[in-house]
Amino acid sequence: MTALGRCVLGHRRLRVVDLETGEQPATNETGDVVAVFNGELYDFGDVRRDLESRGHEVPGTGDTAVIPHVYEERGTDFPAALSGMFAIAVWDRERERLLLARDRIGKKPLHYVLLPGGGLAFASELKALFLVPGVRRELDPAALDAYLALQYVPGEDLGIGGIKRLAPGHVLDWEAGRVHTRPYWELLPTPRDLAEDDWLELVRESVTAAVRRRLVSDVPLGALLSGGIDSTIVVGLMAQEASEPVRTFTVGVDDPRYDEREHARVAARAFGTEHEELVVEPDPVELVSRLTTFLDEPLGDEAILPTFLISEVARRHVTVALTGDGGDESFAGYERYRAMGLARRIGRVPLVPGLAARGLRALPSGRHPRSTPARAARLLETAALPARERYGSLVQVFPAPLRDELYAPAFSASLGPARSASVLLGAPPAPGIAGLQRLDARAYLPDDLLVKADRASMATSLELRSPLLDHEVLEVGVSLPDSLRFAGSRGKVALRRAFGHLVPKELAERGKTGFGIPLGAWFRGPVRELAGDVLLGQRARSRGQLRTEVVERLLGEHARGERDHGHRLWCLLVLELWQRSWLEADLPAAAGYASQTR
């Protein structure tokens, strides 16, 4: 902790570069500009050389030290000069001015809350702000509704005690009790009239450069390898750059729908990596209880569990790991993107979507949500909706009618009608697949996928780096022509073709498996009793949020195999356990937990 007059800054460091001299806070030559920082800057060498050519004296050899000097040169626009993943606070002692900045994609979290009298408290971790006097640990009904619709709460307002997220690519400026935020970057396509070969070369160059930038480290470094095309490309490029075998790590489960060990072995053999596997056979009840110790906001993405487990294994050997996260967002790999186009075409034929969907719904209903009949029914139901509602219907967990049925009368009265997922997400910023990519980059990516990755990895002190989420890679991805996004049923066409020479043939055209766990089996087996005790118990009933008889019906339908509610039950279980752990439990004394300015 460092007291700087009206500002107090605190920091806890994971040492990755400049191990000996990279302590924080960092200052300029006079000590008038002070910075703390979470994350990594990948271009700090170039930035340092530029600053030194302008007469700045930058100490040490790492990235943090450049930040105060970049602020001196660029003022409030300083984040635009930096490339990496970061949450940064800069205190200008002379002006008594605080600047907060978050990286372009939202890889590193940054939360803040406005205090009475014009003060402000901020922190990387939400739980630090729970300790600030005056912050009420309460979940707004609208936030609960959004969570059940999407499995996460989208946007800047978390709906918890007035706490907000600083949006990705934004800077917050506090001075004399006044606050305003503004963007310093926006994900926009760059129209280019290029031949296919030129596009593919641009993809190769941007992805290769992104991987190369993320190999700078003064500690052991490896990669999380699934055998999917994204992580395989990342590991292949790492192997080309490395002088020693790359260390790779894979997690598997005894369910062929999720197990990717054999595919990962193919990639590991192809690139000569030093490979480690973990078969996930934990006590699910114990694992769920561990989740609540580090997940300080409600998140129903079950992939956080295997991410946590593989991070634990990797951290025994390395401090930094590269991942394949971002391939679907940057290069249009999600099936729902293609489904939107199909739904639009099907919807042009009157009556067909609704009739066909009802026919598919008449099939035995215990099928898995990812089964072909289930996906076909969702597609046809989507086609029958107005265009603006289609995308939300494909990504929702609890549809609005089911949420209306689920909510207790008093809670429902405080909320009003449940909002559709499309309303919660807002309209895509542009038509077509590029607009959907940008919509996901605005909501799902920073508020779900990156929350999952950051919380799970940081709980084990492992730093994850995602080259396919480099902002320059994303800019190329949203600029591609549709012919290089989808071809038939295959997505990520540009990525597949650009690196066809690198990916082993047996992996090049395989479909997406997903990084999940067998929730359906869990809620019919080892987690069934826990779920019943937690969701139907007195503590849950006393909240007055959900109708117990509807929750009981969902549990029963799932247990009998009539429906697969595994994902919905998981979201409900996480919500209740999160409220117990973070809204009800006693927390440590509040002194010194969050950085503050008054």
Predicted regions span which residues?
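Adenosyl-5′-phosphate
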Residues: 6, 130-131, 140, 161-168, ...
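Extreme N-terminus nucleophile/cap motif
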Residues: 1-13, 352, 362, 366-370, ...
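Acceptor-substrate binding/catalytic loop of class I
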Residues: 297-301
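Active-site adenylate/phosphate-handling loop in enzymes that bind or generate adenylated species
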Residues: 104, 309-367, 444, 449-473
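Short hydrophobic "helix-edge" motifs at membrane interfaces and signal-peptide entry regions
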Residues: 95-97, 217-219, 262, 314-315, ...
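Short secondary-structure boundary/capping segments
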Residues: 292-294, 335-342, 589-590
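Cysteine-centered catalytic environments shared across enzyme families
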Residues: 1-296, 307, 311, 500-501, ...
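Glycine-rich loop motifs involved in handling phospho/adenylate chemistry
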Residues: 221-230, 255-256, 302-305, 330, ...
